[in-house]
Amino acid sequence: PDGFDIAMIKEIGKRMDKKVEIQNMEFKSLIGAMESNSINTIIAGMTKTKERQKSVDFSDSYYTSNQAIILKKDSKIKKLSQLEGKKVGVQEGTTGDIIASGEKFGEKNKVIVKTDVKRYKKGVDAVMDLKNGAIDAVVIDEKPAQEFVKNNAKKLKLVVDSAGAEYYCIAITKGNTAYKEEINKQIKAIGKKIKARPEVEKIEYQSADEAWEEYKEQYF
């Protein structure tokens, strides 16, 4: 079945009577692709930030997540603030990158101390370097972090010390207000449908616990 994001945008497209064409891209290239008019919609677990809002508009939130820290089993680190000066792996351009760089990604989000950031195209590459001792930690979305640790349970562990909730939104071409309003209308309607019929979430969209499946190509 489709992952949460793909199922969501397909449902929105169906409700708007629009054909949805899916393009897989590296996360860091998405906003640039929108600015060059190669795409007009981004749904990729993207958090709304002030910096991104300079380039794109955002819909209302459709999913809430947190960041997590992946560590080696013997690490003494227990919270984000203890990453000060540590070598931290992140997926380039993601919220984890923003946090590890000591920057805010929202008004209500805590700022952590600045780390020695090492950026990767794929989350799996950061985890590999962690296992090999090249870095001290990986900061990444909680859902893929859980999967990485589950697959490396003898060597890795997970710490969730949220810098604040992050809200996934759909990015839209700057200034396309009518399109944004229509997408917001459909997000609200789909949300009500899921709440009214919990079984629909599993049948049509997968459960929230499986939503990260859609991001596998980005992380692995």
Functional labels for PLM-detected ranges:
Residues 95-118, 150, 157-159, 187-220:
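Ligand-binding clefts/hinges and TM-proximal coupling segments of bilobed small-molecule sensing domains
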Residues 63-71, 142, 146, 150-187, ...:
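Periplasmic-binding protein-like
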